[in-house]
């Protein structure tokens, strides 16, 4: 009797949640959404638009989960197979074009789980010990996994494609070249890299520009991979590899680069991060940061919440905005902003390439110990981010700054890769 009542209650909640979602989707203004649920089809938005998306409900509990968990539950229920889409990127793009509606959905769907997610995110903050566990949770998943979908330079950051026809390999090599040229690296330079990855940039810079490189990571898996790579290349005399938190680094350097590491710093620690970058640079030194950014207009709202990526992909992660980084440079350092380059759409292309290669690898992943839930999680992660970059709710910038002192650089390099 109790089981029957529980089932009846769940069914009632599912129906109520379904009706609430359908009512909210009736306010869709941009693009067209087709929602399929069993034999029913519901169309929302504007017919004849350039953006069409489809959502197929596989389990009626989807609506209840969405009511209780909001956008995070949307990702969870994708992983669990409660819904699917023939093109999840298009669905993310459609929702990104309807941010007012999306905000309304988030306020009405998910308020019950918000306090739990916020507390959990706070517990993942990037203290010295927290940073190591957060980095390990993502980057120590196994080098074989990353080798399967990254390029030969093992670049887990956005490519900069030199042409519409360029491959992932072309784009990542162009990105490495662009970074080195914008820093105007030469044989007399000592470059500090905060966030080694698997060592690709350090090896590229030392090999092609003859500079000395000190590079640091707090991922044991990345450190061990980079150590072997540096030895194979015979670059041990040019590259110093550290397993150390950036906050503990000492000395001064001619040039400093940090590629998509700032997202792992955490909002509360950004002032310390910029002060440390400034301390580590010699007078006249140059800095290049490659960063995923959130739109300035949505930054405050973003800081108040927790999204799917922070919950399941990058624990402790937090995107900066361009204005925030410029403000921190001015308030916390003596550095001056020299140039800013936007490459957001290049990241959308990069993610599309990664996802294609990841899905091609997917049939082999269970043999390596990865579950179907993991595969679906990462598929959604790639689609979620790609859609955001295409619609510019997030973007990718390279920020160049300089310390006071003798410039030692031309300042008028041609800008490539836009």
Q: What are the residue ranges of the model-derived segments?
A:
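Feature captures hydrophobic
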Residues: 1-172, 178
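A short glycine-rich, Lys/Arg-flanked "PGG" loop and its adjoining helix->strand segment in the class I
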Residues: 271-283
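A short acidic, Gly/Pro-enriched loop at the edge of an enzyme's catalytic core
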Residues: 247-257
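Substrate-binding/catalytic lobe of Class I Rossmann-like enzymes that use SAM or dcSAM, i.e.
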Residues: 293-409, 415-418
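Conserved beta-strand signature within the Rossmann-like core of class I S-adenosyl-L-methionine
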Residues: 284-292
């Amino acid at each position: 009797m109790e089981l029957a009542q529980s089932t009846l209650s769940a069914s009632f909640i599912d129906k109520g949640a379904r009706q609430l979602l359908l009512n909210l989707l009736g306010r869709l203004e941009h693009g067209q959404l087709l929602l399929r649920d069993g034999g029913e089809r519901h169309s929302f938005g504007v017919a004849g638009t350039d953006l069409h998306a489809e959502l197929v409900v596989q389990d009626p509990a989807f609506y209840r989960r969405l009511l209780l968990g909001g956008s995070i539950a949307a990702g969870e229920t994708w992983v669990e197979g409660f819904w699917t889409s023939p093109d999840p990127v298009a669905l993310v793009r459609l929702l990104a074009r309807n941010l007012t509606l999306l905000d309304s959905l988030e306020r009405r769907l998910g308020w019950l789980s918000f306090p739990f997610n916020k507390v959990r995110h706070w517990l993942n903050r990037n203290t010295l010990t927290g940073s190591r566990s957060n980095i390990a949770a993502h980057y120590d998943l196994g080098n074989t996994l990353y080798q399967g979908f990254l390029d030969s330079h093992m670049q887990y950051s956005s490519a900069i494609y030199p042409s519409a026809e360029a491959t992932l390999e072309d784009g990542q090599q162009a990105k490495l070249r662009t970074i080195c040229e914008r820093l105007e690296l030469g044989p007399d330079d000592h470059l500090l890299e905060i966030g080694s990855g698997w060592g690709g940039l350090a090896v590229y810079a030392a090999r092609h520009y003859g500079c000395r490189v000190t590079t640091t990571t707090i991922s044991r898996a990345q450190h061990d991979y980079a150590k072997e790579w540096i030895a194979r290349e015979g670059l041990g005399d040019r590259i110093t590899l550290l397993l150390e938190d950036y906050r503990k680094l000492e000395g001064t350097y001619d040039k400093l680069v940090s590629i998509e590491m700032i997202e792992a710093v955490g909002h509360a620690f950004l002032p310390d991060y910029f002060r440390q970058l400034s301390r580590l640079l010699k007078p006249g030194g140059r800095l290049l940061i490659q960063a995923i950014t959130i739109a300035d207009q949505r930054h405050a709202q973003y800081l108040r919440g927790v999204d799917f990526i922070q919950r399941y992909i990058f624990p402790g992660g937090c995107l900066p905005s361009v204005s925030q980084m410029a403000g921190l440079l001015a308030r916390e350092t003596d550095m001056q902003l020299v140039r800013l380059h936007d490459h957001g759409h290049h990241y959308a292309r990069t993610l599309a390439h990664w996802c294609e290669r990841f899905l091609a690898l997917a049939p082999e992943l269970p043999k390596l110990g990865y579950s179907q839930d993991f595969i679906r999680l990462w598929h959604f992660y790639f689609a979620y981010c790609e859609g955001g970059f295409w619609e510019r709710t997030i973007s990718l910038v390279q920020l160049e700054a300089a310390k006071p002192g003798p410039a030692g650089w031309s300042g008028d390099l041609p800008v490539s890769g836009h």
